Amino acid sequence: MPKMKSVKSAVKRFKVGKNKIKRGSAFRSHILTKKPAKRMRGLRTAKYVHSTNVKAVEKMLGI
């Protein structure tokens, strides 16, 4: 049986580390002028996928 294909959009969005899946922050693409610098600094840092979504993301990545 052939290997399962991973979802290519998911491969571009997520990085797999030590037992955790890293993701980028949302709300950073446009209309940035009205958002405070403090908020933008917080959004710059990487986040981890929430435990409720890990199973779905792993399935997309073929893990």
Swiss-Prot record:
GO terms for biological process: translation. PROSITE patterns: RIBOSOMAL_L35 (PS00936). One of its GO terms (molecular function) is structural constituent of ribosome. Transmembrane segments: none annotated. InterPro entries: Ribosomal_bL35, Ribosomal_bL35-like, Ribosomal_bL35_CS, Ribosomal_bL35_sf. It comes from the Bacteria. The keyword Lipid metabolism does not apply. GO terms for cellular component: cytosolic large ribosomal subunit. Keywords: Ribonucleoprotein, Ribosomal protein. Gene3D superfamilies: 4.10.410.60. NCBIfam families: rpmI_bact (TIGR00001). Belongs to the bacterial ribosomal protein bL35 family. This is Large ribosomal subunit protein bL35. It comes from Campylobacter jejuni subsp. jejuni serotype O:2 (strain ATCC 700819 / NCTC 11168).
